[in-house]
């Protein structure tokens, strides 16, 4: 098996890069998907709302939190009980799939990497940092945006806005 872990600030282009990697035969997974499914059940809202930037900013839960704040709160509360809780759920989904090449579009903490390494000990793992041109801080005030700074990534993709040819060339050298 082969795993590509993508990390970068919100808006850096992680999903854009992941989608291009999918076009090369990979299957895309997000560690946040089980969180979004859980929140969808808890709030009785469509799971799609948990991925919609406008809904995450405008929808207010009964306790006054935005949907984004609520998703982060649920994720952190469960991580306090088990730091690998969401990664374990994602790893289980992968175990029951036939996919042999996986790209993670939202890698944010080391527990996710460690869980995948333990679950798939013989897998090849590639860790990639995506940097958007001119983006030095995250537009989202969340500590997980910064948790992998200083990690020794094997590759860095420079996402220069609008230069898809250069972006594709970098991706092909990794996947």
PLM feature spans:
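Post-Walker A helix-loop "phosphate-sensing" segment adjacent to the P-loop in P-loop NTPases
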Residues: 23-29
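Conserved lysine of the Walker
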Residues: 14
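ATP-dependent small-molecule kinase phosphotransfer cores
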Residues: 33-101
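Small-molecule kinase domains that catalyze NTP-dependent phosphoryl transfer to phosphate-bearing small molecules
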Residues: 7-8, 65, 85, 89-90, ...
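Hydrophobic positions on the alpha1 helix immediately C-terminal to the Walker A/P-loop
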Residues: 17
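Walker A (P-loop) phosphate-binding loop of P-loop NTPases
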Residues: 11
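Extreme N-terminal starter segment of soluble prokaryotic enzymes
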Residues: 1-4
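ATP-dependent NMP and nucleoside kinases share a basic, alpha-helical "lid"
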Residues: 27, 89-144
